[in-house]
């Protein structure tokens, strides 16, 4: 499972997204992933330095998330391009505003409000599931805005339903999407079809793969952990 950790620790606070479509909102969290094999041993820092010359030192420090309330959603729903400027290079996400309209509206809103700026990506996994998880400014996997959004565009079928390059929302259960998301960098992920699929990486997937290849500190009980090669979102914007 890829998710956030806060939901179990805080009482839900209901808010309403006023739209043509209305939905319930609450505080959200990000709990880690489900059954994975024990991750590979993390690589030494010297290997990280040698392996990722593309990455600059990051000045991003985990901090308290902005307590943004839900945006007022207005049609039309459109596709967006969300750009993440990281210390390792630029990652562009083609956001599917047609099939995941409320999610994309929210991510567009958060990006342009500066919510993601200077936020460390807090988890990478390299066995069982293959993801880089970001979107919590605290860098701990507990943070999010003051609202959640419903699930949308859940994949159907089985097998490789989240192919490499897919971008999906982390959650702590049904309809608890907040700000945390993950980028799948390798096919054949063993993810269940319960994560809102809202975009695909069209530029910079090689950055995610390179960071993942450096391993993690294996600090997450569910698998993976903090990337050995730090990667942070220094600036995010949406068009």
Where are these regions (language model features)?
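Cyclophilin-like peptidyl-prolyl cis-trans isomerases
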Residues: 2-3, 10-16, 20, 24, ...
């Amino acid at each position: 499972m890829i998710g956030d950790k806060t939901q179990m620790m805080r009482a839900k606070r209901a808010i309403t997204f006023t739209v043509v479509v209305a939905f319930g909102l609450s505080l959200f969290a990000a709990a880690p992933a489900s059954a994975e094999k024990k991750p590979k041993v993390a690589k030494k820092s010297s290997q990280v330095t040698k392996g990722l010359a593309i990455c600059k030192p990051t000045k991003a420090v985990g901090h308290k998330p902005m307590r943004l309330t839900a945006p007022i959603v207005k049609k039309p729903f459109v596709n967006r391009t969300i750009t993440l400027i990281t210390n390792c290079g630029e990652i562009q996400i083609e956001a599917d505003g047609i099939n995941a309209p409320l999610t994309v509206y929210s991510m567009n809103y958060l990006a342009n409000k500066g919510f993601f700026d200077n936020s460390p990506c807090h988890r990478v996994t390299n066995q069982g599931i293959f993801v880089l998880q970001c979107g919590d400014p605290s860098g701990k996997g507990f943070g999010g805005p003051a609202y959640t959004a419903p699930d949308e565009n859940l994949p159907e079928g089985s097998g490789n339903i989240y192919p490499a390059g897919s971008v999906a929302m982390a959650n702590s259960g049904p309809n608890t999407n907040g700000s945390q998301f993950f980028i799948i960098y390798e096919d054949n992920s063993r993810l269940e079809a319960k994560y809102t699929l809202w975009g695909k990486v069209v530029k910079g997937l090689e950055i995610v793969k390179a960071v993942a290849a450096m391993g993690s500190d294996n600090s997450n009980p569910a698998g993976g952990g903090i990337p050995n090669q730090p990667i942070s979102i220094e600036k995010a914007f949406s068009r």
